[in-house]
């Protein structure tokens, strides 16, 4: 009745939505939508490095996005710049570097529209495997840090006083966001990932 590519697209979309829903709750509660945009923009650099080094795209995006997230956390502690200024600086810097690298990789053909908006109909069996292994793993880790993350969302000082280590929970949460971006970038695209984090929540 349905073609294989339609079934794969449906299964992939459901897998991503199941993960982005719980993550998106904290994105909304902690007002991190622009933070998600920053990680999504940095993913372009991860994609270009994956193509240039013939590396796995999802793993490359995860590494680059995680590094950007952890750098951002450290910069927020060590600088007087407003948070939104740091987000804009990192988002557009990583996006610009990614576009420059694409310009130099003339021997590789890039599907820019696919990178920006995704192509869910091009989902392969390997993509489904990554989504349905990576997704539950992200949810499992989120469950483990749910209490300190939720407590610090309500009241950071109280969570710290109770010894819940909110800074560690925040760092782990940013890495989880990098993870969902990595496994969904092919299907959703750079520009729509933040929407997938917010809308299901």
Which residues fall in each region the model found?
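Membrane-interfacial amphipathic/re-entrant helices at transmembrane-helix boundaries
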Residues: 1-18
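Transmembrane helix-bundle core of multi-pass membrane transporters
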Residues: 7-8, 79, 87-147
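Hydrophobic alpha-helical transmembrane segments
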Residues: 10-15, 58-63, 88-89, 128-133, ...
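Generic alpha-helical transmembrane segments of integral inner-membrane proteins
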Residues: 14, 18-22, 63-71, 97, ...
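Hydrophobic alpha-helical segments embedded in the membrane of multi-pass proteins
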Residues: 18, 40-42, 168-179, 191-201
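Short loop segments and helix-boundary regions at transmembrane helix junctions
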Residues: 25-108
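Transmembrane alpha-helix interface/packing and boundary motifs in multi-pass membrane proteins
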Residues: 30, 101-102, 180-188
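Membrane-helix/interface signature in polytopic inner-membrane proteins
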Residues: 140-173
């Amino acid at each position: 009745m349905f073609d294989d590519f339609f079934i794969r697209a449906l299964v992939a979309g459901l897998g991503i939505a199941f993960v982005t829903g719980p993550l998106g709750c904290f994105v909304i509660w902690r007002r991190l939508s622009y933070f998600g945009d920053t990680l999504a923009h940095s993913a372009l650099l991860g994609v270009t490095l994956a193509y240039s080094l013939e590396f796995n795209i999802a793993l490359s995006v995860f590494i680059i996005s995680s590094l950007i997230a952890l750098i951002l956390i450290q910069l927020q502690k060590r600088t007087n710049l407003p948070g939104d200024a740091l987000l804009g600086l990192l988002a557009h810097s990583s996006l610009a570097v990614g576009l420059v690298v694409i310009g130099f990789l003339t021997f590789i053909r890039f599907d820019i529209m696919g990178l920006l908006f995704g192509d869910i109909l091009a989902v392969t069996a390997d993509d489904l495997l990554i989504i349905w292994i990576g997704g539950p793993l992200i949810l499992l880790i989120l469950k483990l840090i749910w209490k300190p993350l939720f407590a610090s969302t309500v009241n950071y000082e109280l969570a710290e006083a109770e010894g819940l280590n909110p800074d560690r929970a925040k760092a782990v949460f940013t890495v989880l966001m990098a993870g969902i971006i990595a496994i969904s970038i092919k299907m959703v695209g750079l520009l729509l990932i933040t929407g997938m984090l917010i809308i299901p929540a």
